[in-house]
From Swiss-Prot:
Protein name: 4-hydroxy-3-methylbut-2-enyl diphosphate reductase
Binding site for [4Fe-4S] cluster: 12, 97, 198
Residues annotated as binding dimethylallyl diphosphate: 41, 74, 125, 226-228, 270
Species of the source: Hamiltonella defensa subsp. Acyrthosiphon pisum (strain 5AT)
Keywords noted in UniProt: 4Fe-4S, Iron, Iron-sulfur, Isoprene biosynthesis, Metal-binding, Oxidoreductase
Length: 319
C-alpha cells in the first residue's frame, strides 16, 4: 500500500499571512490578543493560537477597551469595521486575505456605481458575509446565489446594469456552471477582470483531480468548517473515489484501507503540514510503506504582514 501526496497541498499565502499576524501580535504585544472569528478554519491552528493567548470572539462588543484586535483571513463587513473603529482599541490589524480584499473592492465599486451585484458563494460563510457587507447602495442591490436554480429564480431591478463576483474558495466546476447560467440569463452582466477563485483553491483542486486518477481512496486533511477543504473532498468523490475529510490522523478508520493499494492524501489551504505528516505516520503503522510526492503547480506567492508588525518584529530580534 503506497501513499500518494498531492502537490500543492496545505497552507496558502493568505493563511500563512493571517497566522503570522496573530503570532507576531502575540510576540510584540503579549497575550491576550483578540481575533474576530477563527483566524483560519482549522481546529489545530485555532487551538494552538488559543493556548498561546489568542481569544477568538464573534462580536466586537466582546473586546475590552485598550485591547489588540485582529480581523480573520475571511474579511469583515463595513459595519464591523465601523464598530471596531468606534471602540477604544489599542491597535487593530486586518488579516483579511488580499485576494478576498480584491473581491471586496469589486463589490465596493459596484455599490458606488449603482450596479446591482451578484455574489456566487455559500450562505453563512464569513467570507460571504464580509463581502456582501461591502455593498451599501440602497437604490440598487446585492444578491447571493449558490446554484443554477438560484440564478433561474433571481429577480433584479435592471438586467442591463449587473455585475457578478465569487467567493474565493468555491468549486471551480460548480462556479463555471453558475457563471454560465448567469451569462445566459443576463447577457449584459459583467464579470471580474480576473477570476475571483483564488490561485490556491484552483491549484489544490487540480492536484486532487490528478491525485484521484491514481488513487483508490483520498484523505483530505482539513476541518469541517473549511470551505476549500470540503470542496476537495467533494471533487474526489465526483471523480468516483471514496474520500474522507479528516481533522487529524485520529479520524482514520482502519477498515477504510481494505483492498486499497494507493492512498491519496491532500490538505486544505488552512491545514498545517504537521497534520499531514501525522497522517503519513499513522497510515504507515496501518500497513502503508513509501510515500510519493506527486508533481504539481509550484507556488511562490507571499503576502507580507502589516508594516508595523514587521518593524516591531525586527526590533525584538535585534534587542
Amino acid at each position: 500500500m503506497k501513499i500518494l501526496l498531492a502537490n500543492p497541498r496545505g497552507f496558502c499565502a493568505g493563511v500563512y499571512r493571517a497566522i503570522s499576524i496573530v503570532e507576531s501580535a502575540l510576540k510584540i504585544y503579549g497575550p491576550p490578543i483578540y481575533v474576530r472569528h477563527e483566524v483560519v478554519h482549522n481546529r489545530y491552528v485555532v487551538e494552538d493560537l488559543r493556548k498561546r493567548g489568542a481569544i477568538f470572539i464573534e462580536h466586537i462588543s466582546q473586546v475590552p477597551d485598550g485591547s489588540v484586535l485582529i480581523f480573520s483571513a475571511h474579511g469583515v463587513s463595513q459595519a464591523v469595521k465601523a464598530q471596531a473603529k468606534a471602540r477604544q482599541l489599542k491597535i487593530l490589524f486586518d488579516a483579511t486575505c488580499p485576494l478576498v480584499t480584491k473581491v471586496h473592492m469589486e463589490v465596493l465599486r459596484a455599490s458606488r456605481k449603482g450596479q446591482e451585484a451578484i455574489l456566487i458563494g455559500h450562505a453563512g460563510h464569513p467570507e460571504v458575509e464580509g463581502t456582501m457587507g461591502q455593498y451599501d447602495n440602497a437604490s440598487a442591490g446585492v444578491y447571493l446565489v449558490e446554484s443554477v436554480e438560484d440564478v433561474n429564480q433571481l429577480k433584479v431591478k435592471d438586467e442591463n446594469n449587473l455585475c457578478f463576483m465569487t467567493q474565493t474558495t468555491l468549486s471551480v466546476d460548480d462556479t463555471l456552471e453558475i457563471t454560465s447560467a448567469l451569462q445566459k440569463r443576463f447577457p449584459k452582466i459583467i464579470g471580474p477582470r480576473k477570476d475571483d477563485i483564488c490561485y490556491a483553491t484552483t491549484n489544490r483542486q487540480q492536484a486532487v483531480r490528478e491525485l484521484s486518477e491514481k488513487s483508490d481512496m483520498v484523505l483530505v486533511v482539513g476541518s469541517k468548517n473549511s470551505s476549500n477543504s470540503n470542496r476537495l473532498a467533494e471533487l474526489a468523490k465526483r471523480m468516483g473515489k471514496p474520500a474522507y475529510l479528516i481533522d487529524s490522523d485520529a479520524d482514520i478508520h482502519a477498515d477504510w484501507l481494505k483492498n486499497i493499494k494507493y492512498i491519496g492524501v491532500t490538505a486544505g489551504a488552512s491545514a498545517p503540514d504537521v497534520l499531514v505528516q501525522k497522517v503519513i505516520i499513522t497510515l504507515q503503522s496501518l500497513g502503508a510503506d513509501e510515500s510519493i510526492e506527486m508533481m504539481g503547480q509550484e507556488e511562490n506567492i507571499v503576502f507580507e504582514i502589516p508594516k508595523q508588525l514587521r518593524i516591531h518584529a525586527t526590533e525584538i530580534s535585534c534587542s
